[in-house]
Amino acid sequence: MSNVNDNSNDDVVLIDVYNIIYRAYHGNKNLLTNEKGIPTNALYTTIKMLEKIPDMFSNMRFCLAVFDGGSNNFRKELDPNYKAHRKPMPEELVVQMPYIKEAFRILGWPMLFAKNEEADDIIGTLAKRSGNAGFNTYIISGDKDFRQLVNGRINVIDTMHDICYDEDKVKEKMGVEPKLVVSYLALLGDSSDNVMGVDGVGDKTAAKLLNEYGSMDSIRQNQDKIKGKVGENIRKAFENGQIEKSMQLITLKTDVELHLKNKDMKKQPRNDIEWVEFCKEMNFKSFLNKMPKM
């Protein structure tokens, strides 16, 4: 990407697609269908979210929608229980996936399908790369793991709750600075990814310990000073390697080898002819009504 000094007014937008569509699916309980009986609730809500993005980022220079591939990776090797509790994608969502991908294509969003890496690590790598190049970088996701990346150039946007996580918002919501998010989640645990925390440590205790000692290394060095059952459980979690493993699971990679060129991350104009046909097929009259007369 270009020189830092050239990019300070330009935005890079990275979309965590599976996070968005799962939240769209569960957030819209009205099981919409088209005339063929195909469910469309997640598709409809995802498109509504996509419609907002160009207005949110008027200086969007590059963007990418990243789809998870579902393959095994180093985290599964490190802990076979990682995400093991997750149920298969609901059938009502499975049947919508081809249409969701088609909507992204027709609307002109560049896409990347993760294969041997998690989408989170690809997004983490691109965010770090674009932030270092001086771009204002925005990750569209409700996944709290991304908050570890937040800095003066990287923000996380939770579109479902209309929250922009900059450094101050991370501190407000989690009680710790972004640089301590990995340690915070390792103490607390992350049920969404089946990552173990320390028994008896809740969000307030995790934040208190990290703010008091300043880092996980400092907590390790001073673990004998932590009293009560919490101290006992922390010492046990250090001794059996649980904390170290949890931190490895939570830490996003920012060095994934990617062969993307600038042109691979440029949004294209919507194909209006295809879009009209798509909306008719899906029975999306509200989107058709927004179209200029052709």
Question: What is each residue range found by the language model?
Answer:
Residues 4-9, 57-61, 153, 164-294:
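Non-catalytic nucleic-acid-binding/docking modules located in mid-to-C-terminal regions
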Residues 16, 141, 161, 200, ...:
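Conserved residues at beta->alpha junctions
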Residues 2-137, 146-155, 159-164, 244-245, ...:
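Noncatalytic, basic helical substrate-engagement surface that gates or grips nucleic-acid strands
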